[in-house]
Amino acid sequence: MRIDKITLTNFLSHEHSEIQFMGEINVIVGQNGAGKSSIIDGIVFSLFRTHSRGNNDNLIRKGSNRGSVTLYLSNEKDKIEIIRDIRSTTEDRLIRNQFPIARSATVVSNEIEKILGIDKDIALSTIIVRQGELDKILENFQEIMGKILKLELIEKLIDSRGPIVEFRKNLENKLRELDRIEQDYNNFKKTVEEKRARVLELKKDKEKLEDEIKNLEKRIKDIKDQFDEYEKKRNQYLKLTTTLKIKEGELNELNRSIEELRKQTENMDQLEKEINELENLRNIKLKFEKYEVLAKSHTEMSANVINLEKEIEEYEKAIRRKEELEPKYLKYKELERKLEELQPKYQQYLKLKSDLDSKLNLKERLEKDASELSNDIDKVNSLEQKVEETRKKQLNLRAQLAKVESLISEKNEIINNISQVEGETCPVCGRPLDEEHKQKIIKEAKSYILQLELNKNELEEELKKITNELNKIEREYRRLSNNKASYDNVMRQLKKLNEEIENLHSEIESLKNIDEEIKKINEEVKELKLYYEEFMRLSKYTKEELDKKRVKLDEMKKKKEEIEKEMRGLESELKGLDRKALESKILDLENKRVKLDEMKKKKGILEDYIRQVKLLQEEVKNLREEVNIIQFDENRYNELKTSLDAYNLSLKEKENRKSRIEGELESLEKDIEEISNRIANYELQLKDREKIINAINKLEKIRSALGERKLQSYIIMTTKQLIENNLNDIISKFDLSIKNVEMEIMPKTGRGRSSSGDILVYTNSGDTLPIVSLSGGERIALSIALRLAIAKALMSNTNFFILDEPTIHLDDQRKAYLIEIIRAAKESVPQIIVVTHDEEVVQAADYVIRVEKRGNKSFVREET
């Protein structure tokens, strides 16, 4: 799998860069700080989502909110696209042959490892060589191999503080816990047996009590039946005797009442004879009363006749006056009608006059405004030219200020980068950079910044002055422009207003006669108004109403004559009678009549009481017979009641004892159930004892198998041979005096450190040399060959090799040697990517990518 292309969007100094790797040896060349290594950072971030820049936000280009990297890889079968979003892990995607197969950071990383067979630790230690780390693999060979082969992880597993020992300790703690559980298990078994024995004892007591309760309930039932029968008799006896006493009392009371009523009704016949005369006397009294009513009606009727005669006289007088006023009333109504007809035109006339006054006032104001505005019109054109010239000056000053600020920002960034440099090597170009040189660069930059700041202050002051002047001119220009528009508007309004005023004059002239006519009519109405109001007051007096009153007067006179005739008839009938003596006699008879009515009522009550006495005497006789039949004995009743209460008390005591036993039984059974559940739970836990013992033994065997003499030795042995074969095969393709190389990889010791191990080199002349005896060029060649050999052995699907600034610290001779090695290495790896600032390395390339920085952005161009 080779790298085809990478796209960087807002990544470090790259805003949007698309880099294609079309050759076997691809060289990325550019000045220090141009953004070359950022491309390698992008490849590493795409593959493993890792970097050495601290927080992920540090990868996003300054001034941007988001950033992303897309890496394209391919082989004969597949095309892979890896998309990484710098800020959001959920947006990461993996696309295979244009089909999405994974999403989110972790899933994408796992899938990349499966498909490409790339392990992060191996890749970063072998095929991706960071700046200054080319021969680090020779210096730290044992440590790097331990990391690559995961020997450190195996050692951590079997360490005395590792997870295997920790897990074994946990299992041993569980065994000790099971010993404690077994002791509790035996104690609980003993307790449950004791409780079960107590349950059996209580159940026997309960059965005995249930038999006793059953016998008692039977005895109580027998006595209760007898008592209920006697209770029934007693209730019947008490009911009858109570009723008998009540009836005897009622009988005695009735006899006393009968005797009293007989005395009170002795003179009833005599009273009836006297009262028969009362009706005749009453009729005479009614005639006296009727005469009084007729006399009163006669008096009232006479007064009404006199009043009605006066009213008729007034009516006749009012009607005559009404007839005199009617012509003036009709004249008044006619004038009112005429006023109503003229009113719309008169209102129109008033409205037109009001409109004319308003428009004349408006015209006066507009003429005044037009006079004032005409003075500002000539100034607009000259101000317009002045605004344009001042704006150009402002834009020029802003451009100069932006340029100065950009230069200040660049110098501050240089100072910041120099201040953060650790050691005496420039991180950008790799050249020597001692403290004196650093301070000199910083001093020069600060001096330049000071000069720029002074320039900036002058520009800002001048810009502020120009801006204030422009604002002032623009405000005046806007005011005058608005005044010109206002002047035009005022003139249009005046023209329209003059036309409207002329029209209003014409309309008012046509309606002028209406005003005079209205005034004349109002004067006539004023003269007739009093006559009109008097006529309206007399309008209620009509001839029809007068005729009705005359008819009514005739009827009243006729009625008066009838009353006089009836009064004369009654006077002849009542002649010689004394009304007061008559009324006294009637009153006495009325009192006797009331007394007679009371006697009649008492007579009826007396007869009813006599009937009730007969009935009560019969009831008393029957009740006495029923009492004799019952034969109730109070002593026998009390004897049965006492016996029943005693048996019920005994039954209640036994039932209480039974309830207490049942409560204790329920509690015991609940305890037994809970303890049995705990026993069953303990039995399940105790079954695990054998499994735990077996697990402890197996853990010891696993720990032993993972030790340095077993699994580690096996991994080293199988890997070592494969790497050596690959290494010697690659070296044979280089033009070196090395015949063969052997490696010694040692397992991790129990103390967590690697045992001694080494790389031995056999020369063509038969000598055996350690690494330290090799020349600089041979060390470079061996480092590259060893990295490729390890990668080929452990990552069979990886076909690229990346070198970041491999020429750093190399002299010209070694650089030339490195170029030859890179050319030779392409026989072992199909794709090599080299990042460098040395133009000499371009000689080895068949595809060149140039990177340069403009301002704070990196730009890429490709050369074939």
Swiss-Prot record:
Its cofactor is Zn(2+). Pfam families: Rad50_zn_hook, SMC_N. The two conserved Cys that bind zinc constitute the zinc-hook, which separates the large intramolecular coiled coil regions. The 2 Cys residues coordinate one molecule of zinc with the help of the 2 Cys residues of the zinc-hook of another Rad50 molecule, thereby forming a V-shaped homodimer. One of its GO terms (molecular function) is ATP hydrolysis activity. This is DNA double-strand break repair Rad50 ATPase. Binds 1 zinc ion per homodimer. It comes from Saccharolobus solfataricus (strain ATCC 35092 / DSM 1617 / JCM 11322 / P2). Residues 176-319, 376-413, 440-697 form a coiled coil. PROSITE patterns: ZN_HOOK (PS51131). Zn(2+) binds at C426, C429. ATP binds at N32, G33, A34, G35, K36, S37, S38, Q131. Residues 380-478 form the Zinc-hook domain. Keywords: ATP-binding, Coiled coil, DNA damage, DNA repair, Hydrolase, Metal-binding, Nucleotide-binding, Zinc. Part of the Rad50/Mre11 complex, which is involved in the early steps of DNA double-strand break (DSB) repair. The complex may facilitate opening of the processed DNA ends to aid in the recruitment of HerA and NurA. Rad50 controls the balance between DNA end bridging and DNA resection via ATP-dependent structural rearrangements of the Rad50/Mre11 complex. InterPro entries: P-loop_NTPase, Rad50_ATPase_archaeal, RecF/RecN/SMC_N, Zn_hook_RAD50. GO terms for biological process: DNA repair; double-strand break repair. Belongs to the SMC family. RAD50 subfamily. GO terms for cellular component: DNA repair complex. Disulfide bonds: none annotated. Homodimer. Forms a heterotetramer composed of two Mre11 subunits and two Rad50 subunits.
